[in-house]
Amino acid sequence: MNKKIFTLFLVVAASAIFAVSCNNKTTNPTSNSSEKKIVTEEDFKNAIEGLTYKTWAFTGKGKSFNFGSPITVEATSGSDSLAGVEKGFGNALKSALAAKGIDTGNITFDKGGASSSDKTSVSFKFTPKALGTSNFEEKLKSSVKEVEIKLTPKENWGA
């Protein structure tokens, strides 16, 4: 009889411990930082549309952007030095796209034949990489090799 009571006690105790452990909720949850934001083509276009740098107006450029065609933008007034636009616009572009979850990787600056005494367009080229998984990321991987943004000053490039 004592053996049966002892066995019953062990079964009840084990069941109680199991029930308590299954209901144990963590008191300090941690976020999963490996989860990435899903980036869409609209995010990319909004980032281009929202770009701001000195007197270049990007309004209307993002919404009409087609991959494979350069985005051409003219300054509304004044100009910038070639060195200034290389650093300043390059950083603005990288920041605007990063805010939408798009990695530009290396941005190359091509001044072509531009000099401080002319208005020749300069180009910024990069290959975007979307963070996360989406149809846009697949499109980037399969068809988009490079995005080009051409800037033309209103007046000659400054020194």
From Swiss-Prot:
A lipid is attached at residue 22 (N-palmitoyl cysteine). Residues 1-21 form the signal peptide. Coiled coil: none annotated. Keywords: Cell outer membrane, Lipoprotein, Membrane, Palmitate, Repeat, Signal. GO terms for cellular component: cell outer membrane. It comes from Brachyspira hyodysenteriae. PROSITE patterns: PROKAR_LIPOPROTEIN. A lipid is attached at residue 22 (S-diacylglycerol cysteine). It is a lipid-anchor. The gene is smpA. The keyword Repeat applies. It is found in: Cell outer membrane. This is 16 kDa outer membrane lipoprotein.
